[in-house]
Amino acid sequence: MRITISGSPGSGTTTLGRSIAEKYSYRYVSAGEVFRGLAKERNMDLAAFGKIAETDPAIDLEIDARQKEIGESSDDIILEGRLAGWMVENADLKILLCASPECRSTRIAAREGLTEKQAFEMTIEREACEAGRYMEYYEIDILDFSPYDLILNSETFSANELFAIVDAAVSSLLKRE
């Protein structure tokens, strides 16, 4: 089974992805892990590699291509990333987590040690930048939810409730196999 989990920063994709991967003993691959792997391959620290990535579209394109390749050639895997649902066309279940910018900013502030105002401003700026890149590189409108099978509001449901919903969906799909 191939599962993708996408969502904006702070929506809970990592928490959900790791929980589902642990339950089913699936491999978990995040876009962040792919980014770190590319930095390591180039013998660069993350800060330096991140600076290059800001201005070099080839890095984004390579991260997305690697995630697509891993997802389409692997079984029993969870792929987590903003574009995972778009990139892994043969996924069995494509999940999108949503939450308001205010909710996500609160989570990011707590996780990153920022004020909520800082987190909110950073989040809005990052999302606008990403939306532009996704449209430019792939003609993907990040607000088009059509590729997704399951869209959940992580502001409405707790992490445990999200896990239970997705667990039920995965169990149902596994029974079909």
Curated annotation (Swiss-Prot):
Coiled-coil zones:
none
Kindly list the positions annotated as binding ATP: 7-15
Which domain of life does the UniProt lineage start with? Answer: Archaea
GO terms of biological process kind: pyrimidine nucleotide metabolic process
Name the InterPro entries for this protein: Cyt_kin_arch, Cytidylate_kinase_dom, P-loop_NTPase
Cellular location(s): Cytoplasm
In its UniProt record, a GO molecular function of this protein is: CMP kinase activity
Any one annotated GO CC term = cytoplasm
- Documented EC number(s): 2.7.4.25
Q: Which UniProt keywords apply?
A: ATP-binding, Cytoplasm, Kinase, Nucleotide-binding, Transferase
Catalytic reactions on record: CMP + ATP = CDP + ADP; dCMP + ATP = dCDP + ADP
Question: Entry's NCBIfam families?
Answer: cyt_kin_arch
Identify the HAMAP family for this entry: Cytidyl_kinase_type2
What family is this protein classified in?
A: Belongs to the cytidylate kinase family. Type 2 subfamily.
Which protein is depicted? Cytidylate kinase
Please state the gene responsible for encoding this protein: cmk
